[in-house]
Structure formats: structure tokens, C-alpha cells
Amino acid sequence: MLLTVDVRNTNIVLGLFSGTGEYSKLLQDWRMRTDPRMTADELALTFRGLLGTHVDEITGVAALSTVPSVLREIRVMLERYWGHVPHVVVEPGIRTGVPLLVDNPKEVGADRIVNSLAAHHLYEGPCIVVDFGTSTCVDVVSAKGEFLGGCIAPGLEISTDALASQSAALRKVELVRPRSVVGKNTVECMQSGAVFGFAGLVDGLVNRVRDELPEFGGDDVSVIATGDSAPLIIPESDTIDHLERDLTLEGLRLVFERNQARRGSGRRPVA
């Protein structure tokens, strides 16, 4: 079985896959809060506890981290606890199969690369990926699977938290759809601004991408959403076509399999 590890600023998501290629299947996933102070031993103890009896069935590990301190500990953990199985950490120098057509490829987050790979694999054409995480990323992928760049905006939760913490008369509210756009109390007003406002933000960015890039103006372009807040925003969006909850885990699986195939052929993995 393949263990996939997706470390972000807010959460760590683990996914357990059986099979490979078209026969692969995500059997189970787990979520935990990210603690940038966690050591390699603490990470391994937590992961092994979640995996339970599956821990001895792991035949490979693929991981990414957008948190530098955790990335270092992930590397140590893999060597110490899973050094006997093939493992891949997505970072510069690792082959992903995604050409990065940007000014500085090393600046592109591993999560954005992996999402782009999975989206193009699933929909086989030009696509726009919207990841609702700590930040809101809108990434543009060509029909050839090239990463063309994108947009980064604050995330839904971090925006509402900042609003509450920086405003004396406002407090943190539950992020749910309000009764209407026109709120009748402060809580509903904040919920309206968050839910409908972010739907408008995403729609605006997607439409601007379509206007700016002629090849993204047609009906063959797939707009795919992922991330914890995606199910809340999608019903209010006019541009998002698909929800792929496990997009990043699927991308990690693809990166692992591509690197294994490369090693099996005797060729050295390249970016």
C-alpha cells in the first residue's frame, strides 16, 4: 500500500492507497492539525497510530510539505521509520512530469504542482485548479499539462480570523451559508461577506484568466476545486465545474508512480 502525506499550514492529510495506475483506490484518509514544532519521532508515532494494522503493509510513501520546519522532519522520519521502502518527497529535483513555465520554478509550491498534475491526469485538457486552503490558489494548466502560473489570495478562514481579531466590534463566526446575501445581524453579515464574497473572488479570477488567455475561453476548460472550504463555496460559484476532494493525494500517488517507473527504467529522476 502507498501512504501519501500532504502537509499544509493548517492541516496534515494522510491517504492510504491500494493498487497502482488505473487500479489504484484511496482506501482511507485522516486529517490532523499541523504543528510546526513536531519532531520526526512525533510525526511517526502519530502516523503509525492512525495507520494501525496497516502500518506493516506500507510499500511506499509520497509526501509534500509547504511548512519548511515540518518538511525537514518529514525527511528524517522517512529515513528513520520508512527507509526500507521507496519514498518520494516532492521538492526541487523530483520528477513530476509538470513543466513549470514561470519565472522561477523553484518558487512554485509542491502542492500547486501536484494539484496541477492530478487535475490534468483526471480531465485530460486545459484546466484551472482552485485550492481553498490557508491561501486560495487559482492555478492554470495548459492542454499539454504545463503549469502556466496563477493567482494566490488569502484563504477563507484566515481572512475571517483576521477580520475578527483586527476589529473590536466583530468576533469569529461559524463559516456556513447565511440565509441571504443581505444579512440581518452581524454574524450573518460576516458569513455573507465570507461565503458570497469568496465565491465572487474566485469567479472573478477565473473569468479574468479566461479573458486573458485565448486558449482558456472555450467550453473544453475544466475548473476544478479542492480544499477544505470548497464544498461551502462551490454552490455559490458560477465558474467551478468539479469538486475533487482528494486531488492532492491523487497527485502524490502519480508522482510516486512516475518516479518508481523512472527508477525501474534505470534513468535518473529529473524535475
Curated annotation (Swiss-Prot):
MF-aspect GO terms: ATP binding; metal ion binding; pantothenate kinase activity
Reaction(s) the record says it catalyses: (R)-pantothenate + ATP = (R)-4'-phosphopantothenate + ADP + H(+)
Residues noted as binding K(+) in the record, renumbered to the chain: 131
Residues annotated for substrate binding in this entry: 109-112, 186
One cellular component term from this protein's GO annotations in UniProt: cytoplasm
Record-level GO BP terms: coenzyme A biosynthetic process
Keyword terms of this UniProt record: ATP-binding, Coenzyme A biosynthesis, Cytoplasm, Kinase, Metal-binding, Nucleotide-binding, Potassium, Transferase
Record flagged with keyword Nucleotide-binding: yes
EC number per UniProt: 2.7.1.33
Keyword Kinase listed: yes
Domain of life assignment: Bacteria
Cofactor: NH4(+); K(+)
InterPro entries (UniProt xref): ATPase_NBD, Type_III_PanK
Function of the protein: Catalyzes the phosphorylation of pantothenate (Pan), the first step in CoA biosynthesis.
Subunit composition and interactions: Homodimer.
Entry protein name: Type III pantothenate kinase
